[in-house]
Structure formats: structure tokens, C-alpha cells
């Protein structure tokens, strides 16, 4: 889920470079071409456009979200939930987790992004998981992370803070003071 405060892929006019928006459109076009026809030539064009956009102002993990939005069955969204989910060997094969671990620490350049995408797709195509494609994976990551967050929240609510516990002793302490 994208934070509305970071919903754009470019900086304000005074902050961005003259070709930032054109670079985004170029990436959009070559991403569609790659999704429709995965060839070495299209991968090369995609890589050049992606790497150019990668270093632009306001580009972080959101670039992977944008790719996912235009072709969700081709491009993986590497938002924080998906990264958390696919970095866990309970959710993805151990080989994948090891191969992707370092690449998920910072926004990957095109070569690493395509490798993560390809390895993840290969793991999903193997059919060992209930999620069979990137949209299913994203949905499952969202559901599981919500469950984990709710469990953490309920555990936190169950714990009584020491300050809360001490409030019960205030009347007793006051009575002892009054007795002298």
C-alpha cells in the first residue's frame, strides 16, 4: 500500500531535472514491451531506462510498485510488506531467500531487480505455495502481515505497564502517609 505522501514518482518542478518525467515515460514504455515480449533486447532497454530512473529524486521502492501496477503478473512489487514476506524461508525457498537477501536491503538496480523477479517467478511457478503469481503473493503478504500486526498489538495490550500497576498502590501509599 502506497503512502499518499509519496504517491508521485518525481520531485517538484524546481527540484527535478528536465528529463525526469520523460525518463519515467520511457521506463513505462519499455516495461510494457518487456512484459509483452521478454527478449534480451527488451531486457537491455528496460535495464537502461530503469537504472536511469533509479537515481532520480523521489524514486525508491515505489518504482517497483509502479511496475507492478502496470503489469502485476510480470513485475514484482518490492514494498516493505513483500520484502518482509519473501525474505522469510517459511514463505519462499531457502535458495531464493539467500539469493535475494542482500538485494532487498536497498532499492535494487535493474540487474538485481530482474534477478529477484525471475527467481521469485520461478519459485512461484514450481507450485509449492498457495500463491502462484505476484498478485497472489502480494495479497498473502498483506494478509499475513496484518495478522502479525494484530497479534503484536493484542500482546502489547495484554501486558500491563509497570506504571499502570503502580497506580493501584497510590491509595495504599496515601493511606500509609496519612497514618504517619
Predicted regions and their residues:
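An N-terminal alpha-helical hairpin/helix-loop-helix interaction module that forms a charged
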Residues: 1-56, 72-179
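Short hydrophobic alpha-helical segments that form membrane-spanning helices or hydrophobic packing faces
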Residues: 63-70
